[in-house]
Amino acid sequence: MLVDLRMRSAALGALFCTMALAAPAAAIELPTAQARAELLDTLEREALYRDRVDWPEMRARLSAAQGNPEKIRDVLKEAIGRSSGGHGAWLSVERMRSEATRSGRATAPAAITASDATAAAQSPALDPRIGQVEIGGFSVVPGPAVVQQMQERAARWQAIIRDQDTGKRCGWIVDLRGNTGGNMWPMLLGMAPLLRITKEGEETVGSFATAKDPSPWRSTPSGMRLGTRVIVDLGTPGYRLKHPGVPVAVLTGPRTASAGEATVLALRGRPQTRSFGEPTAGVSTANVVRPLVDGSALVLTTSVMRDRNGRGDGLKITPDQHTRSDAATVAAAQAWLLAQPACAGR
C-alpha cells in the first residue's frame, strides 16, 4: 500500500497497516548505509514515540552490526518498531513495486465501479428495518489517478447505503471488523450519509494530534478535508439519508486497524451511536511516507488519531459493549438499535 512518496499530502497518505521489515530469509533486503543513517535521523527527529529510544545506543549497535545483514535488519526493525509503537515500517524498492502491482490489480476501475448489489444484501439474521454497510480496508495505487480512486470507492460505499435506504430503515450497522486499514479518506466519505448529522456545512469528525496544533478531519456535504485542505471531493453533494441522524451501531474487532480505527473514531461521539464487538488492533496512529536516498522509503508514524471530542491515545479502541462471537456482536447491535425510539415506534 504505497502512496505518493514525499506524501504530496501527509493527508493522502493517510494510514498504513503494520508492515514487516524482514524480507524472506533467502534474501535479506536492507537500505544502503547512507539510507540507514537517514532513516535513524528521521526517526529520531519525527517519530511519534522517539523518546522511547536511546538513539546513541541504537546507532552504536548498528555500527557494531556492520557486515551482518541479519543484525542490521534486527536493529533497524527495533528502532522503527519502538519509535512507532509497532505501526511504522521500512519499504524496499522491490517491496514498493510489488505492493503497487498488487494494489493495481485489486483496485482496477472495473472492480471499483461494478455494482455492489450482492455485497449490500441483507444478512438473514437482520431485521428488515436495519440497514448494513461493511467498510473494508482500501489502499490507493500511487500515481495521477489517486483522487479518482478515492472518489470511486467512496461513491461505491455511498451507493450501497443509498440502495438500501428505502425510507423504512430505522437504524444502521457499520461493520468495521474486517477493516485492516489503508486510506481513511474514501472510508469516511463513503459512510458520510451515516457519519454526518447535518445537511449543510462542515462537521469535525476527528483529528490528527501532534506536538503542534491538531489537524481536524472535516466532513462536508460532498467531501473530506484535513483542516482547510480538500483531500477528496465528489464534486456534488453526496447521498443523504431519508432519515438523517438515525441510530448507528458500529462493529469492531482485533482486525480493525489503522485507517479502520480512524473510521471507528470518526463515528465515536456521534449522537445515537454505540459500538459492539472486541477491541481494535491498537495502531490508532497516523503514518506518512518519507523517501530515502536509495529509493526505498520509511513509513513514519507521526501522530495520534482522536475522535470528534478530542479523545484518543493511539492504542486499542474498546467498544462500548464487549461481545465475543460474530453472532453475538450482530445480535447485540440489532437489539440496541431496535430498542431506540427511532425503531421502537415502527
Predicted regions and their residues:
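Bacterial N-terminal signal peptides
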Residues: A11-A20
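A broad, low-specificity signal marking well-ordered, structured residues that form hydrophobic/aromatic
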Residues: S9, I130-G131, T273, L298
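Terminal targeting/pro-maturation regions of precursor/exported proteins
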Residues: A26-I173, R177-G178, G345-R346
